[in-house]
Amino acid sequence: MQLKDFDFDLPASLIAQHPIKNRTDSRLLIKRSSIIDIQFNQIGDFFQSGDLLIMNNTKVIPARLFGTKETGGKVEIMIERILDENQVLAMIKASRAPKIGSCIFLENDVNIIVYQKDNGFYTLIFETDSLFDLLNNIGHTPLPPYIKRTNNVQDLSRYQTVYAQKDGAVAAPTAGLHFDDSLLAQLKIQGIDHLFVTLHIGSGTFTPIRTDNIKNHVMHSEIFEISQVTVDRINLTKANGGRIIAVGTTTVRVLESSLKNGKLIAQNGETDIFIYPSYQFRIVDSLITNFHLPKSSLLMLVSAFIGRDKMLELYKHAIEQKYKFLSYGDAMFLEKNNDL
């Protein structure tokens, strides 16, 4: 398939720039025999007792830092991945690239050594005993490039799921932003439980596809984890006829990456899985996801799940009804198309 097959006109006015007041007040598009437009807090009406929600519990770190080179030039650092207790993989924006072996000075007198560069990413060594304390003190929330404003205090909590546990992401698993503790408790009373996987989302999630033939696209790699507890519960749910409902595309990528010889395996690893039309889903039955950019890998995953024509139909409806798109936008709840 060609990249142009996944294009559509997205009015800039529909790209949400701020979160709404209450998480669960966002809008939700549901496709059954017809298109249903409701609020997210009504989603429980479309679940069945015995369904299982799988959520990504990664936690967004304050990954943007500002510093000064030895020459006095200003730099912006965007952390991509934590490597160990004081080393990170990062991108650096500067008028001139920093030299390998040079220092970058942060505002709290912490030095960073520019250790090496590979494939556009720098390995940086922080001269600190507590990297996470440092980031929490002077780091900034790494808002996506399509949010055209500076971050604020509200983003610290709202660009984070209420169930975020494991530090490591530089972008939020945005489908999960619509849940609050009250909704999760209500669903549990209905017999709909939730468990977690982890995928630390990197900045590669925002990288545009540049190949005309989408099959030639090389997907970015991200660290993930799925526990034996989650694997066992998924297997039990399926055996009992319940649905596996993935909250977000990152959860889908973990689940579909964790199969070996047709069996779901607990593991820690990395995945560069690229899901596009013709992919056969083996674990996920239903998907909750936000609205995505034209020609993005996330849009292709949705197209693989429900069919490209159906995706374009739903997106046309969403644009006509002025749904909000992307991270702080609205959501859709989809059933897998088993006829693809």
Swiss-Prot record:
Give the enzyme's main class according to its UniProt record, as a single word: transferase
Q: Which GO terms describe its biological process?
A: queuosine biosynthetic process; tRNA wobble guanine modification
Task: Output the Pfam families linked to this UniProt entry.
Answer: Queuosine_synth (PF02547)
List, in alphabetical order, the Gene Ontology terms for molecular function in this entry.
S-adenosylmethionine:tRNA ribosyltransferase-isomerase activity
Task: Note the InterPro entries from the entry.
Answer: QueA (IPR003699), QueA_dom1 (IPR042118), QueA_dom2 (IPR042119), QueA_sf (IPR036100)
Q: Where in the cell is it found?
A: Cytoplasm
Q: Under the cellular component aspect of Gene Ontology, which terms does the record hold?
A: cytoplasm
The protein's matches in Gene3D superfamilies, at most eight in alphabetical order, are given as: QueA-like (3.40.1780.10)
Query: Which Enzyme Commission numbers does its entry carry?
Result: 2.4.99.17
| Chief localisation class | cytoplasm
What is said about its interaction partners and assembly?
Monomer.
The record's function comment reads: Transfers and isomerizes the ribose moiety from AdoMet to the 7-aminomethyl group of 7-deazaguanine (preQ1-tRNA) to give epoxyqueuosine (oQ-tRNA).
Q: Which NCBIfam families match?
A: PRK00147.1 (NF001140), queA (TIGR00113)
Q: What is this protein called?
A: S-adenosylmethionine:tRNA ribosyltransferase-isomerase
UniProt organism field:
Vesicomyosocius okutanii subsp. Calyptogena okutanii (strain HA)
Q: What gene name is listed for this protein?
A: queA
